[in-house]
Amino acid sequence: DITSKFLIPEESKSSAYIICKEQNGAVLSGIDIARYIIEELGGSIEFNKIKNDSEDLNYFDKICTMSGSTQILLIMERIYLNFLQHMSGIATYTKKFSSIASEYNVKIADTRKTKPGLRKIEKYAVLCGGGFNHRFGLFDGILIKDNHIFAAGGIKEAIDKIRNRVPHQLKIEVEVKDWKELGEAIKSNADIIMLDNMELSMIKESVKVIRESLGSRCKIEVSGGISLASLEEICKTGIDIISVGAITHSAPAVDFSLEFE
């Protein structure tokens, strides 16, 4: 930070705080990462946390205070604010979905549509917003998608092959997009059926058919094109899970500001 080095003496000390500048409020995520950046990477900065991750924030709420080298506070400013803005943005956007879905006992889950290198913190931010984590990668859950179905020769063939090899504790989820695939998934006793990019009317009928055939043993997930506007009507259909890629890849950043005192 050549600007700070030219303007501010090395021995200068200051006190500062970070405030939320979202007029409609936000959900905090990333405060401990900010503390790590400041304390571990920034040298002898004293950091005091005021708010915790997952807490609701109001406009102008202070989330922490800091004191120490003026140069270090300014050099590190954009780094820790970027993490706070991004992670709190995900938590805040997730909360908008989860607060509606929870009224119907429906879980909002994330996807693998995350920024390269940031999946762990983005999925943590989803938890801060009341959401749930879907698979972290391709190693911790079985999800048979359209290309798997094509490669295996059909849903029944795919499920049979996996069932013969899968550890007993792993559930088998299959993605379906039409009536034919839904029928195959039901006949194959899939543990979880994902209804992919279906119209509301088809979701309703699909839920009815699944419940009549498999009862509540089979979990029903909906995915594809879910928005806040369509969310409540989808929740009313009796599904269990809605996976929303937008909560990680399209969440608006939350505005935070560093202020000196």
Residue ranges and their predicted role:
Residues 198:
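Glycine/alanine-rich phosphate-binding loops at beta-alpha junctions
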Residues 224:
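Periplasmic-binding protein-like
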